[in-house]
């Protein structure tokens, strides 16, 4: 999940800030105590964020303890947060403090008293709300070498992406006004330039950073769940480092043909720092997903890493939410009822043919001292938010992080990212930070090492100067429409943008399974996967569906600043809407494209679209075939009413056959909701 070797140190530093209330030695003691039935004492919370004037009582949690002899509470800074003799904290003014509780206790299996000092870090904020500042990712001119995408024979017509039902009917409000273009400004070029080039299928997204992919198949579509690196980009800026600390949401996309992707947007799961679902979680990294029938209906479960030391779970009744917190607490890791002997990082979830589900996890950061550097696997209970049975180690050689688990044929495949250590013996040819795999006859193992399947992506997609762009990776294997595919991430998009920030982008290439069940090495490239089916332009198409785009955004983010201008946190707004990003000095038209649309033998008669814009404004909309300046199918002016709404049906040129479509906008669009042709 992390990108650079130095991130090992960075993650350790991040862990020291997030895993509060105990040191790593404390985690070791707690995990060991659980397994050996020894006494444990800990605080009800390791970190609190309070507003000035608020009060909160810390409680002592104990296990296998016969008697508490004494408790002494102290604060490192009473002017910020005071604490009473009974553990009640009073937040006084903005700042930070550490609350300590010195506990003297006697274990059930002992007559001697032991003493332990527990900690809770407290952050006190002013009792006022900061003003949100909405920002957009800067538009840069990318340097991308176009690649050729192989043509695939069409097979079936893809199904449309599911549409979430609105929860209420909004009361119309007047649309915001826009800043008019300066007529004296002449655009440097006619069309915005795509960060991913004109013909490439990789990366999957051209207008945002999204990483740590996990893919599942559901009802004829593949859904990909990713970490929202764009959130970190907003917090750090083009010249900042990707430290993952601002990421509190996941990004979800889906496709029926592996080329045209519908952007379902971002979903804030962690709420400890921003306005997310689960207030006890600070970060949302490396989400994974599965579904199973519960009470006769399909139910979806998202597992993710909370700051590198805990794993949380959210539930939903559809693959794209809305998501809800069914468990109400962290699932796995320190300060939970499921402490692990390993590092609770980078979960992967697998549901077997019999309906049994398993969670596998692990990493090399925050691992309890003395424990083996191996991933762990544990069977989930039927409710999917608790466990059924004990965890077991998978003895994966040179394991680092990023687990995956699949069933291929009659074998169970465990895959993972290798570490940076020097190899010896039978593993001397195993690349650093590559994806390796093992096989077993049972989900719980034992697993046998097979080999490497995905070399380090930085040896394929290099830096602008031609040197290797070595980084850790994160992957996902999925079977879709009879074939296997490997999802992974690279920093190709940031290289194209010419920025320092190591934003990661998800790719996909085919994974070939040989007759004996082993894998060929995945051939990584920008071509990606050939289109699996013709696209139907006569269905209602979400404006969030595209194979490529430029000068357009889909997700939205609020950057919350302190008074001195320093970023406090970055809140990702749930969902998405396709909108133009106006930069008149650089380009005239923003655009999106659809690959492989079948217009039929007679071609369309009309083009329909629904948009939102600025009140009483207008935008020029064009639809062209096969190129940005290709054959015009539609060229019309869209006029918005005072509410910013527009719904059009205009004549279309009867272009026949299969074509790539380019939908182009000269002007400002707040939300390109949907479109379709009619015969």
Regions found by a protein language model. Name each.
Residues 2-26:
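Sec-dependent N-terminal signal peptides of Gram-positive bacterial secreted proteins and lipoproteins
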Residues 8, 27, 41, 50, ...:
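Extended hydrophobic/Leu-rich segments
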Residues 10, 16, 70, 118-120, ...:
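Residue-level detector of intrinsically disordered terminal segments
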Residues 18, 25, 32, 46-47, ...:
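Serine/proline-rich low-complexity intrinsically disordered segments, especially terminal tails, linkers
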Residues 24-141, 146:
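Extracytoplasmic soluble-region selector
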Residues 95, 176, 180-632, 637-679:
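Carbohydrate-active catalytic/glycan-binding domains of CAZyme proteins
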Residues 128-186:
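Ser/Thr/Gly/Pro-rich low-complexity, disordered linker/stalk segments of secreted
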């Amino acid at each position: 999940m992390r990108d650079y070797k130095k991130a090992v140190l960075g993650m350790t530093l991040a862990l020291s800030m997030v895993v509060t209330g105990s040191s790593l030695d404390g985690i070791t003691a707690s995990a060991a105590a659980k397994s050996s039935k020894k006494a444990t004492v800990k605080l009800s919370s390791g970190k609190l964020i309070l507003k000035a004037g608020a009060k909160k009582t810390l409680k002592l949690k104990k296990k296998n303890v016969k008697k508490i002899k004494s408790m002494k509470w102290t604060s490192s800074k009473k002017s910020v947060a005071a604490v009473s003799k009974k553990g009640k904290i009073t937040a006084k003014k903005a700042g930070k403090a550490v609350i300590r509780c010195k506990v003297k206790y006697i274990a059930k299996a002992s007559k001697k008293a032991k003493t332990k000092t527990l900690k809770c870090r407290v952050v006190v904020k002013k009792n006022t709300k900061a003003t949100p500042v909405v920002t957009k990712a800067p538009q840069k001119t990318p340097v991308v070498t176009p690649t050729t995408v192989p043509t695939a024979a069409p097979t079936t017509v893809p199904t449309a992406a599911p549409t979430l039902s609105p929860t209420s009917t909004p009361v119309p409000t007047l649309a915001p006004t826009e800043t008019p273009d300066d007529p004296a400004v002449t655009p440097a070029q006619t069309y915005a330039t795509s960060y991913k080039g004109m013909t490439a299928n990789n990366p999957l997204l051209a207008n945002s950073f999204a990483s740590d992919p996990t893919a599942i198949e559901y009802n004829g579509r593949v859904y990909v769940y990713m970490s929202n690196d764009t959130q970190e980009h907003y917090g750090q800026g083009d010249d900042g480092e990707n430290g993952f600390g601002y990421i509190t949401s996941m990004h979800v996309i889906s496709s029926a043909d592996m080329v045209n992707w519908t952007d379902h947007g971002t979903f804030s799961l962690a709420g400890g720092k921003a306005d997310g679902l689960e207030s006890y979680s600070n970060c949302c990294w490396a989400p994974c997903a599965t579904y199973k029938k519960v009470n006769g209906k399909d139910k979806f479960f998202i597992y993710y890493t909370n700051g590198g030391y805990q794993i949380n779970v959210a539930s939903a009744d559809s693959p794209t939410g809305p998501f809800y917190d069914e468990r109400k607490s962290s699932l796995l890791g320190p300060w939970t009822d499921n402490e692990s002997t390993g590092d609770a990082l980078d979960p992967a979830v697998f549901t077997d043919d019999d309906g049994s589900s398993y969670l596998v996890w692990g990493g090399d950061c925050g691992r309890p001292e003395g424990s083996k550097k191996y991933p762990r696997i544990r069977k989930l209970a039927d409710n999917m938010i608790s466990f059924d049975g004990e965890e077991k180690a998978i003895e994966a050689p040179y394991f680092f992080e990023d687990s995956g688990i699949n069933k291929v044929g009659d074998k169970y495949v465990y895959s993972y990212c290798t570490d940076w250590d020097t190899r010896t013996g039978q593993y001397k040819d195993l690349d650093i930070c590559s994806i390796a795999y093992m096989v077993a006859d049972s989900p719980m193992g034992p697993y046998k090492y097979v080999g490497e399947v995905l070399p380090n992506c930085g040896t394929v997609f290099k830096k602008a100067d031609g040197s290797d762009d070595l980084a850790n990776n994160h992957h996902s294997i999925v079977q879709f429409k009879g074939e296997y595919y490997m999802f992974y991430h690279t920093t190709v998009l940031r290289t194209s943008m010419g920025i320092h920030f190591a934003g990661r982008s998800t790719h996909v290439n085919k994974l070939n399974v040989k007759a004996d069940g082993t894998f060929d090495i995945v051939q990584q490239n920008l071509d990606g996967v050939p289109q699996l089916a013709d696209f139907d332009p006569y269905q209602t198409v979400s404006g969030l569906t595209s194979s490529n785009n430029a000068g357009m955004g889909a997700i939205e983010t609020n950057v919350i600043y302190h008074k001195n201008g320093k970023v406090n946190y970055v809140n990702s707004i749930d969902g998405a809407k396709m909108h133009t990003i106006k930069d008149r000095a650089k380009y005239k038209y923003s655009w999106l494209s659809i690959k492989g649309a079948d217009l039929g033998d007679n071609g369309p008669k009309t083009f329909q679209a629904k948009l939102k814009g600025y009140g009483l404004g207008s935008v020029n909309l064009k639809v062209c075939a096969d190129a940005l300046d290709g054959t015009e199918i539609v060229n019309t002016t869209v006029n918005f009413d005072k509410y910013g709404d527009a719904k059009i049906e205009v004549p279309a040129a009867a272009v026949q056959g299969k074509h790539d479509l380019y939908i182009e906008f000269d002007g400002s669009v707040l939300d390109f909701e949907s479109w379709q042709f009619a015969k």
